[in-house]
Structures are given as C-alpha cells and as structure tokens.
Amino acid sequence: IISHGKKFNLGLEAGSKPELHAVIAVNTDSDSLIVCNGYKDESYIELALLAQKMGKRIFLVVEKMNELKLIAKMAKQLNVQPNIGIRIKLASSGSGKWEESGGDASKFGLTSSELLEALDFMESKGLKDCLKLIHFHIGSQVTKIRRIKTALREASQFYVQLHAMGFKVEFVDIGGGLGVDYDGTRSSNSEGSVNYSIQEYVNDSISTLVDVSDKNGIPHPNIITESGRALTAHHSVLIFEVLETATLPEWDDEEVIAPDAHELVQELYGIWDSLNQNKMLEAWHDAQQIREEALDLFSHGIVDLKTRAQIERLYWSITREINQIAEGLKHAPDEFRGLSKLLADKYFCNFSLFQSLPDSWAIDQIFPIMPIQRLDEKPDRSATLQDITCDSDGKIANFISTRNVAHYLPVHSLKKTEPYYVAVFLVGAYQEILGDMHNLFGDTNAVHVSVNEKGYNIEQIIDGETVAEVLDYVQYNPKKLVRTLETWVTKSVKEGKISLEEGKEFLSNYRSGLYGYTYLE
C-alpha cells in the first residue's frame, strides 16, 4: 500500500493506538494524511500531537465528546494547534450485512446536539480554526448506491452549515463502504455484491459536494475515502492442496445380491434395478421408507452390520440415479432440489477456515473459488471443501453460481500421481488479520508476486508460522516442552519401555515437528 500508493500521496488511517504506532513509522511522506479514528486516551492523543508537531499531517477525529476535551488539554500542554476532525452520526445508513454500522444505531459519532456542544466548546477554548475535517461512515460493503447518495447529501449539509457558522472545514472524510463485487452479479440483491461501479461512486461523491459548495458559495472540500476493502480485497489469493476425498457409498453395477439376502435388501435392489423416470418419485419414497426401517431394525439388533451396509450402498445409488434424471428435467419435483447438495463429495484441504477465511465461517461470506489446474478438462465431480481442523464448522458449502448460490463446487477427480490445488480469490481484506488459531493452525506460507508486461516476479517468500511460534502465543514455552519430553523419554528408556535408538528417534521427530509448519507437509 505504501510503496504503490506513494505516487498518489496515499494517506493512512489508524483505528487504535497500536495501529497509530505502525502508521506513524511507515508513513514517511510528511505530506500524506494520517487520520486517527477509534477510541483515544491521553497517550494516544499525545503521540499524535507530537508527531504533528514534527511535521506529520495528522487529524484527530473526535468520536466521543470526552475525546475533544482530552485533545484540548493535551494540545495546550504541548503547545500545538491540533488538526481536529469530528465524526458525525448521520441518520442515513448503508445496506447489506453492515447496515447497522451507520444510522442512529451507529457505535461512533456525535449527534446533532453533541456536535453543537462540541462547536461551542472549541470556540470557548480558542480552537475554532482547528476544526479541519468532518467524517462519517455508513457501514462496510454498502450494496446500494442510493444509500451512499443519500448519506452524501446529508453530510454535505453539515459541511455547508459549519461554514455558515464560521468553521472553515477543509476536508470531508466520507469513510468506507465502497463495496466489492464478490459474486459477480453486480446487484444489490446480494450481500456479496454492489449495484454500482467505482466510477459511479466517485462521480456521485464529487458531484454532490461540488454542487452544494457552488450553490452556497463556499470552497470545494478535499474529499477523503477510507475504502480499505475495495483497495485490498483483490491483492490476495489463498491456495491450498486437496489432501483426500470422501464420497458416499454406491452399489457396484456388476454386483448381484445373494439369494439369502435380507428381504429389505432384495426389495431395495429391485427398486434400483427397475428405476426409470416414470417411477422415480414413487421409487424415492419407497427407498426412504426402506432405509428408515432398516436403520430402526439395526438399532434394535435385528439387522446386522453387513445388511446395513448393503442398504446404504443401494440407497445412495438410487439417490444418485434419481438426481441424474431430475437434473435433466425442466420441472423436477421439489423433493429432488436438495439431492445435489446431499450427494456432493467432501474434498479435505490443507488449510484452516478459521485462520485463513474467517468471514466464510463467521458471516457466511461467499468468495470466488475454483481449481487452478486441469482447466482444460471438464470437472467430473461436485464437492464441498473441508478444512483440517477438528471442527465440523470448518467447511465451505456455499459457492458462487450463475443461479443464486450453489451448495457444491465443480471439481475434478483426484489423480494419485499429481497434487490438486484450489484457489480462493478476493481474500485481501480482513481475512488474514481476523484469522483465529483454532486447533493452533498459524499463518500460512505467503508469496509476494508482482506482475509486469513480461510476466511476473516473485518478490518475497514468507514462511508460515511454526508449531513452536504458535504454542508460544498460547503460553507454552517450546524449550520447556522439549525438556519435559527429554525427561520422560529418559525415564522410559531406563524402564525398558523403548530402546535408546527409539528414544532418540522420538525426540528427533518431536523437535523437527515443533519447529516445522503447522499445516500438513
């Protein structure tokens, strides 16, 4: 962001004290802006004001009234004229998942009454000329441009009113909200898309503020956006290997049932053997009834395990054939709509959903996902993706489709002789920083790649976290763990439970794993 944004004089926003420490150090261009949001204490404000005193263009945005009083106090102590911004709580709100981030229910911002109180306070403290910026935020990933335009109109009147009151505001920070078209629909009907382009967003933002300024004879403001999602989402791709698959059992076409097979098996075999389009609904109902009866008999010890397994294989074979027939029909019975989801394979993949795609788990965010090899082959399987955590929530079962949401991903059958990789796109916003170490899976390996006219360059390779690093985060000292194991192994050797060579091999494997990758290798 810093290197590529330098020619655009790109500024940075800090939403907390730790972020401010990072921003001050990396934003070396003294002419670019630093906007300070979030809750602030005296040390946060002092750090910002001292950085301003040394030449940084820092704006302290007041989120709550008490912050303004702290800014006035610290500015007087440090003998500096602060650049003050005020976050205004608009009545307008966004649309989509984060609609409640704006409007009257917003966590941050001053109401109209609080704004007047703040203006009176600044005037009484001789800080009237220090109010340089107003800010609003109506939520992330705003799906409808109409909501953005409504908020802009409302905010523009605050700009006009403040100028009329003698507060010469220079900047209007229109916050975040610029959305990303994750699912490709370019529609406000989906929370994973938006019904506008970046150009339309820019046109509306500028024209609204320019028009209202011209009508009231006041200067055009400098417009700031905090479009972090739109700026970063496209830069990152998550790639992982499929380790193995699991499919539902099926009956071998060449297999014939034994004459003494259980009557339920014989009945279900007859349904499978005579299945056709005309009889498929009746066959489906009969198959379900037989399966339920067989499971009940098994639970009471009347049917043995072999019979249960035969029932399962026949039942799922019938389900597959019915689904194949139904998919070819224009108007298939409603009962068959969920069969494709039910029949999907499970592809177990070398990643943690909670570490690398937390939004997929937490808010059902849908990302573009596809295999990245064998693209000249038609996929022959349908699958959901399972991660390697021990949590049943660690799966992706919703995918982008040309028709609403698909509950499986078209994939290829695995080949024993070659790996199979799947990629998840548009993961550059929020996913890495929100990642959770569920089951102690850490950060993944990362590669920084730049694209040019001749192709691409690998700029940097960053190793993922080791087991030792992750254990250290949760207060397990790796060296102490090794010492504990050494004591235990020595005791086991002395007691004759293992040989000396076996003990050495165990410790070698333990140390190697401790300082190795948290994912499967």
Locate predicted features.
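Active-site-proximal beta-alpha core segment in soluble small-molecule metabolic enzymes
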Residues: I1-F171, L178-G184, N195-E200, T208
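Single-residue recognition of alpha-helix boundary sites
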Residues: N27, R146, R186-S188, V237, ...
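A structural signal for short, well-ordered beta-strand segments and their strand-loop junctions
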Residues: V61, G85-R87, D173-G175, I223-T225, ...
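Flexible glycine/acidic-rich beta-alpha junction loops that bind and position SAM and/or redox cofactors
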Residues: S92-G96, E170-N189, I224-I239
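Alpha-helix termini
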Residues: M122, L152, G179, S188-S190, ...
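Charged (often Lys/Glu-rich) extended helix/loop segments that serve as interaction or gating elements
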Residues: Y196, D204-I206, V210-E521
